[in-house]
Regions:
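An N-cap/entry alpha-helix motif that binds or orients negatively charged groups
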Residues: 2-79
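N-terminal active-site wall of soluble small-molecule enzyme domains
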Residues: 61, 66, 73-174, 180-185, ...
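Structural recognition of alpha->loop->beta junctions
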Residues: 83-95, 188-200, 243-245
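Catalytic cores of alpha/beta
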Residues: 131-142, 178-189, 226, 230-249, ...
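Catalytic-face loop-and-helix region of soluble metabolic enzyme cores
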Residues: 193-249
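C-terminal helical cap(s) of enzyme catalytic domains, especially alpha/beta-barrels
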Residues: 213-217, 240, 255-288
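Glycine-rich phosphate-binding active-site loops on the catalytic face of alpha/beta enzymes
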Residues: 138-158, 196-204, 242-263
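Active-site beta-loop-alpha junctions enriched in small/polar residues
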Residues: 19, 67-69, 102, 129, ...
């Protein structure tokens, strides 16, 4: 994977999006959109429940992520069982679960999403590079309650159309931004849940100042979610005090021996006001982001 990322150069996102469009075309030839539309008609995603889960006052709202691999770190977990990980997240206080389904760069699949859906009651987010309506239908039929929409991967027309279509299917949408220009585009498109990714999808660099710099620009009525690079209870407390309603945490949990226990430690530290930077590190040798 390191060699693959090296060949991509400075714009990994463009490479992933191109690969995604090709892969989706292949899947659609095997299973037409009309067939998925028929299946989706009998499914009722919990999009409203997803949004509600992120906005409970007086609670630290964590979306725990299931992810086998990342382009920046390679394999995160050889013994990857997303259903068991998700169940552990739920047992230790996660309000939702994010599941990577992108196959080429993250080794994810819709089967992972289905397994998680069967294992938990809390809302499930399909995290992928959504660029076509077909992927929304896939998400619905696989059991997702919400999807990730990455502003940097879409033009304004695509973003608006996918957001509207997701809503019409009953899906929630976590609309991801990295800078002020992308935030303005998300707001213009009508995004309600806005995730600020501290990791640049073009360079993979992580900077928590992305979340700190943008929180003041989130309009009233939107739900801010801080993503990537969150490792300690202190991170959650400081960003929560700044105005974020929820936090999406992936690699920092996936690289611990017991991801659910690690999530519980973060929650306990944030609830008690223990901002010790070692709260999560006590359960991890490899580190994470």
């Amino acid at each position: 994977m390191t060699d693959q990322v090296g060949r991509v150069g400075s714009d990994l996102l463009a490479t992933i999006v191109a690969a995604t469009r090709h892969a989706v075309g292949e899947r659609e030839r095997g299973c037409p959109a009309s067939e998925l539309t028929s299946r989706a008609a009998s499914v009722s995603p919990g999009g409203a429940r997803f949004v509600a889960a992120l906005t409970v006052r007086g609670r630290v709202n964590i979306i725990g992520e299931c992810k086998r691999r990342s382009p920046s770190r390679g394999i995160l977990r050889a013994d990857y069982r997303p259903d068991r990980i998700a169940a552990a997240y739920e047992a230790h206080g996660a309000v939702a679960v994010s599941v990577l389904t992108e196959p080429t760069f993250f080794d994810g699949s819709l089967d992972d999403l289905r397994a998680v859906r069967a294992a938990v009651e809390i809302p499930v987010l399909r995290k992928d590079f959504i660029v076509t309506p077909y992927q929304l239908l896939e998400a619905v039929t696989a059991g997702a309650d919400a999807v990730l929409l990455i502003v940097a991967a879409l033009d304004d027309a695509e973003l608006g159309a996918l957001l509207d279509q997701a809503t019409s299917f009953g899906l929630g949408a976590l609309v991801e931004v990295h800078d002020a220009a992308e935030l303005r585009r998300a707001v213009k498109a009508g995004a309600v849940v806005i995730g600020v990714n501290n990791r640049s999808l073009r360079t993979l660099a992580v900077d928590l100042d992305a979340s700190r710099n943008l929180v003041g620009q989130l309009p009233p009525g939107t739900v801010g979610v801080a993503e990537s690079g969150l490792r300690t209870s202190e991170d959650l407390m400081s960003l929560g005090a700044a105005g974020y309603k929820a936090f999406l945490i992936g690699e920092a949990l996936m690289t611990t021996p017991e991801p659910g226990v690690a999530l519980g430690r973060l929650l306990d530290g944030a609830r008690s006001g223990d901002g010790d930077a070692r709260v999560l590190a006590r359960g991890v040798e490899a580190g994470g982001s």
